[in-house]
Amino acid sequence: MNIEEMKKIAAKEALKFIEDDMVIGLGTGSTTAYFIRLLGDMIKKGEVSDIVGVPTSYQSRLLAIESGIPVATLDQVDAIDVAVDGADEVDPNLNLIKGRGAALTMEKIIESRAGMFIVLVDERKLVDYLCQKMPVPIEVIPQAWRAIVEELSIFNAEAKLRMGVNKDGPVITDNGNFIIDAKFPRIDDPLDMEIELNTIPGVVENGIFADIADIVIVGTKEGVKTLER
């Protein structure tokens, strides 16, 4: 089973948690894209009804509309029943690093308010500790990026401004901000680090999602496995 197949089976497993009349937070990224398309197929087949999606990015909003999912913004709904998204890393306590898609701020806003937060990953994303493989994305006010990179050196982080692909200059988030990718030696206390990073002036939000995931669905070569907090 290849990586894309692992992503697909994880996305398909998440559909088991979807019921009629749900408001669903729709994450951003390649694995979540499979879920959005499959959810759209369920709606078209009449297998589920009265679904509203709350996208975390323009990308997921466009895909949801294309897939036939009614969409709304966060301020148009009373509550989020379930949120579904991917992750860049998952540690043994189900703490996450997210934000390779540069949508981390809205992802955290929506997913922290969900009645249930389901994370979809392939087996490569499971790590022994956060920052084992991937840096922590940090959304920052553009004028503050250089000062923040300097301040991150206190944490022995290798930090750099994320540059765009197929465009000149830095990546610009949906909120009009920059992304700094910070590679720490390791993160042993994700919640403490998440809080501390957000105290740096100019930081909008960071990609550590501590104590927030309820269920992690993992696509593996042998099939699907589900991890619960």
UniProtKB/Swiss-Prot annotation:
Gene3D superfamilies: 3.30.70.260, 3.40.50.1360. Its EC number is 5.3.1.6. Pathway: Carbohydrate degradation; pentose phosphate pathway; D-ribose 5-phosphate from D-ribulose 5-phosphate (non-oxidative stage): step 1/1. GO terms for molecular function: ribose-5-phosphate isomerase activity. The active site is at E107. Keywords: Isomerase. SUPFAM superfamilies: D-ribose-5-phosphate isomerase (RpiA), lid domain, NagB/RpiA/CoA transferase-like. It comes from the Archaea. Substrate binds at T28, G29, S30, T31, D85, G86, A87, D88, K98, G99, R100, G101, K125. GO terms for biological process: D-ribose metabolic process; pentose-phosphate shunt, non-oxidative branch. Transmembrane segments: none annotated. InterPro entries: NagB/RpiA_transferase-like (IPR037171), Ribose5P_isomerase_typA_subgr (IPR020672), Ribose5P_isomerase_type_A (IPR004788). Pfam families: Rib_5-P_isom_A. It catalyses: aldehydo-D-ribose 5-phosphate = D-ribulose 5-phosphate. Catalyzes the reversible conversion of ribose-5-phosphate to ribulose 5-phosphate. NCBIfam families: PRK00702.1, rpiA. Belongs to the ribose 5-phosphate isomerase family. This is Ribose-5-phosphate isomerase A. It comes from Pyrococcus abyssi (strain GE5 / Orsay).
